[in-house]
């Protein structure tokens, strides 16, 4: 009779109903980099008073970030999920801006941090996502997959036998 079952690696597709033998840790920060939560313009909030026109100097798209640092009075067109350029601290939403020949006009002043998702604000590297002893359901499988694990350590399933001996069960 074993009181503690040994651990074994279990693939994602076989996890439902299993018991975690170890804590599941985040393998990286999520989001992995500071990015925009909205389509709009990345800028320095202090430069964007309502009515102010900023120089439009480029674009930052998912997978193709704007490389140079943003200077005072500059803005960069940005897509949702795209990396924030260095020096930017806010997003001016498309609906709060007007693109003009001389640049982009702020129709409303964004606050510092507006519509910005910071690196690691959801999950930090090494953060415990699921605890040892937890029974895995579909939600937990999604957490494991989202954390980048293909397999996790689970307690081996117990083997149970029923032995019949005459009229009694042992």
Regions found by a protein language model. Name each.
Residues 1-50, 54, 118:
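Short, low-complexity N-terminal leaders and the immediately following helix N-cap/first helix
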Residues 42-170:
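Short, glycine/charged-enriched hinge/interface segments at domain edges or termini
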């Amino acid at each position: 009779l074993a009181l503690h079952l040994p651990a074994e690696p279990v693939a994602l597709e076989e996890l439902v109903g299993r018991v975690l033998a170890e804590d599941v840790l985040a393998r990286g920060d999520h989001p992995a980099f500071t990015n925009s939560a909205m389509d709009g313009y990345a800028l320095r909030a202090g430069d964007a008073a309502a009515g102010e026109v900023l120089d439009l100097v480029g674009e930052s798209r998912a997978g193709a970030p704007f490389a140079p640092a943003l200077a005072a009075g500059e803005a960069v067109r940005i897509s949702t999920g795209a990396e924030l350029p260095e020096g930017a601290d806010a997003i001016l939403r498309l609906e709060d801006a007007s693109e003009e020949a001389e640049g982009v006009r702020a129709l409303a002043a964004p606050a510092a941090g507006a519509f910005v998702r910071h690196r690691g604000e959801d999950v930090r590297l090494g953060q415990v996502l699921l605890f040892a002893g937890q029974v895995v359901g579909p939600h937990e499988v999604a957490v494991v997959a989202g954390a980048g694990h293909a397999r996790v350590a689970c307690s081996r399933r117990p083997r149970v036998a029923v032995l019949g001996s005459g009229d009694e069960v042992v």
